[in-house]
Amino acid sequence: ALPISGTTYVDGKNIQDYPIYEVSEYVGSVFQNPRSQFFNVDTDSEISFGMENLTYPREKMKERISKTVADLDIAHLTGRSIFELSGGEKQKVAFASIYAMSPSIYLLDEPSSNLDMDAIEDLRRTLELLKKQGKTILIAEHRIYYLRELVDRIAYMENGAISDRKSVV
Protein backbone atom coordinates (compact mmCIF):
# COMPACT_ATOMS: atom_id res chain seq x y z
CA ALA A 1 0.00 0.00 0.00
CA LEU A 2 1.12 3.53 -0.72
CA PRO A 3 1.84 5.84 2.20
CA ILE A 4 -1.08 8.15 2.88
CA SER A 5 0.50 10.38 5.47
CA GLY A 6 3.82 11.78 6.53
CA THR A 7 5.58 14.80 7.89
CA THR A 8 7.43 17.47 5.95
CA TYR A 9 10.25 19.39 7.56
CA VAL A 10 11.85 22.53 6.14
CA ASP A 11 14.91 23.84 7.95
CA GLY A 12 14.12 21.45 10.80
CA LYS A 13 10.58 22.79 11.22
CA ASN A 14 7.41 20.76 10.69
CA ILE A 15 5.51 22.86 8.15
CA GLN A 16 2.20 21.64 9.52
CA ASP A 17 2.91 23.76 12.60
CA TYR A 18 2.85 26.98 10.54
CA PRO A 19 0.10 28.77 8.64
CA ILE A 20 0.34 28.44 4.86
CA TYR A 21 1.11 32.14 4.39
CA GLU A 22 4.26 31.75 6.51
CA VAL A 23 5.37 28.68 4.56
CA SER A 24 4.75 30.48 1.25
CA GLU A 25 7.28 33.14 2.23
CA TYR A 26 10.12 30.67 1.81
CA VAL A 27 8.65 27.80 -0.26
CA GLY A 28 7.22 28.39 -3.74
CA SER A 29 5.59 25.74 -5.92
CA VAL A 30 4.70 25.53 -9.58
CA PHE A 31 2.18 22.89 -10.58
CA GLN A 32 2.31 20.64 -13.65
CA ASN A 33 -0.82 22.35 -14.99
CA PRO A 34 -0.26 26.09 -14.47
CA ARG A 35 -3.94 26.84 -15.18
CA SER A 36 -4.79 25.25 -11.84
CA GLN A 37 -2.77 27.86 -9.94
CA PHE A 38 -3.88 31.04 -11.74
CA PHE A 39 -6.07 33.47 -9.83
CA ASN A 40 -6.05 36.33 -12.35
CA VAL A 41 -6.88 36.85 -16.01
CA ASP A 42 -3.85 38.97 -16.92
CA THR A 43 -0.15 38.21 -16.62
CA ASP A 44 0.87 41.29 -14.64
CA SER A 45 -1.73 40.65 -11.92
CA GLU A 46 -0.74 37.00 -11.80
CA ILE A 47 2.96 37.76 -11.36
CA SER A 48 2.20 40.17 -8.50
CA PHE A 49 -0.52 38.03 -6.87
CA GLY A 50 1.64 36.22 -4.30
CA MET A 51 3.39 39.40 -3.25
CA GLU A 52 0.04 41.15 -2.80
CA ASN A 53 -1.16 38.31 -0.57
CA LEU A 54 1.96 38.67 1.57
CA THR A 55 1.36 42.45 1.69
CA TYR A 56 4.62 43.48 0.04
CA PRO A 57 4.93 47.29 -0.15
CA ARG A 58 4.04 48.57 -3.64
CA GLU A 59 7.60 49.81 -4.32
CA LYS A 60 9.09 46.44 -3.41
CA MET A 61 6.55 44.73 -5.68
CA LYS A 62 7.48 46.96 -8.62
CA GLU A 63 11.17 46.29 -7.97
CA ARG A 64 10.64 42.50 -7.75
CA ILE A 65 8.47 42.44 -10.88
CA SER A 66 11.11 44.37 -12.87
CA LYS A 67 13.82 42.01 -11.66
CA THR A 68 11.67 38.97 -12.49
CA VAL A 69 10.87 40.19 -16.01
CA ALA A 70 14.56 40.93 -16.67
CA ASP A 71 15.98 37.77 -15.06
CA LEU A 72 13.50 35.46 -16.79
CA ASP A 73 13.46 37.41 -20.08
CA ILE A 74 9.66 37.56 -20.18
CA ALA A 75 8.92 41.16 -21.22
CA HIS A 76 6.96 39.72 -24.16
CA LEU A 77 4.56 38.07 -21.69
CA THR A 78 3.70 41.18 -19.67
CA GLY A 79 0.41 43.00 -20.14
CA ARG A 80 -1.29 40.00 -21.74
CA SER A 81 -4.39 37.96 -21.12
CA ILE A 82 -3.76 34.55 -19.57
CA PHE A 83 -6.26 33.14 -22.08
CA GLU A 84 -4.11 34.04 -25.10
CA LEU A 85 -0.96 32.31 -23.84
CA SER A 86 0.35 28.93 -24.97
CA GLY A 87 0.86 26.17 -22.41
CA GLY A 88 4.58 26.94 -22.23
CA GLU A 89 3.95 30.67 -21.78
CA LYS A 90 1.50 29.91 -18.97
CA GLN A 91 4.19 27.78 -17.33
CA LYS A 92 6.62 30.72 -17.53
CA VAL A 93 4.08 33.11 -15.97
CA ALA A 94 3.33 30.61 -13.18
CA PHE A 95 7.05 30.31 -12.50
CA ALA A 96 7.48 34.11 -12.64
CA SER A 97 4.79 34.57 -9.98
CA ILE A 98 6.82 32.38 -7.62
CA TYR A 99 10.21 33.79 -8.65
CA ALA A 100 8.98 37.33 -7.91
CA MET A 101 8.52 36.31 -4.26
CA SER A 102 12.12 35.03 -4.12
CA PRO A 103 11.56 31.95 -1.96
CA SER A 104 14.59 29.99 -0.78
CA ILE A 105 12.97 26.69 -1.83
CA TYR A 106 11.29 25.89 -5.17
CA LEU A 107 9.02 22.87 -5.66
CA LEU A 108 8.42 22.16 -9.35
CA ASP A 109 5.98 19.49 -10.55
CA GLU A 110 6.81 18.31 -14.09
CA PRO A 111 8.05 21.77 -15.14
CA SER A 112 8.86 20.65 -18.70
CA SER A 113 5.50 18.99 -19.41
CA ASN A 114 4.02 21.84 -21.50
CA LEU A 115 7.28 22.95 -23.07
CA ASP A 116 8.89 22.52 -26.48
CA MET A 117 12.65 22.02 -26.85
CA ASP A 118 13.46 25.76 -26.92
CA ALA A 119 11.34 26.40 -23.82
CA ILE A 120 13.01 23.46 -22.04
CA GLU A 121 16.37 25.10 -22.73
CA ASP A 122 14.99 28.36 -21.26
CA LEU A 123 13.85 26.37 -18.21
CA ARG A 124 17.31 24.82 -17.85
CA ARG A 125 18.89 28.30 -17.90
CA THR A 126 16.39 29.49 -15.30
CA LEU A 127 17.20 26.54 -13.05
CA GLU A 128 20.89 27.30 -13.51
CA LEU A 129 20.18 30.88 -12.34
CA LEU A 130 18.37 29.60 -9.24
CA LYS A 131 21.24 27.27 -8.44
CA LYS A 132 23.74 30.15 -8.75
CA GLN A 133 21.54 32.14 -6.36
CA GLY A 134 21.87 29.32 -3.82
CA LYS A 135 18.21 28.29 -3.99
CA THR A 136 17.04 24.78 -3.14
CA ILE A 137 15.10 23.19 -6.00
CA LEU A 138 13.04 20.01 -5.71
CA ILE A 139 11.74 18.76 -9.06
CA ALA A 140 9.35 15.91 -9.85
CA GLU A 141 10.09 15.16 -13.50
CA HIS A 142 9.90 12.39 -16.10
CA ARG A 143 12.25 14.10 -18.54
CA ILE A 144 15.56 14.24 -16.72
CA TYR A 145 17.96 14.63 -19.64
CA TYR A 146 18.01 18.44 -19.38
CA LEU A 147 18.69 18.27 -15.62
CA ARG A 148 21.69 15.93 -15.64
CA GLU A 149 24.37 18.64 -15.44
CA LEU A 150 22.36 20.80 -13.02
CA VAL A 151 21.26 18.53 -10.22
CA ASP A 152 23.23 17.39 -7.20
CA ARG A 153 21.10 14.31 -6.48
CA ILE A 154 18.47 12.24 -8.24
CA ALA A 155 15.92 10.11 -6.40
CA TYR A 156 13.88 7.63 -8.41
CA MET A 157 10.32 6.93 -7.28
CA GLU A 158 8.45 3.68 -7.79
CA ASN A 159 5.01 2.86 -6.37
CA GLY A 160 5.06 5.95 -4.16
CA ALA A 161 8.44 5.27 -2.56
CA ILE A 162 12.05 6.19 -3.32
CA SER A 163 13.53 3.18 -5.10
CA ASP A 164 17.01 4.52 -5.84
CA ARG A 165 19.18 7.57 -5.15
CA LYS A 166 22.17 8.81 -7.05
CA SER A 167 24.59 11.58 -6.21
CA VAL A 168 25.52 13.38 -9.42
CA VAL A 169 28.10 15.84 -8.14
How would you label these PLM feature ranges?
Residues 141-142:
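H-loop/switch region of ABC-family ATPase nucleotide-binding domains
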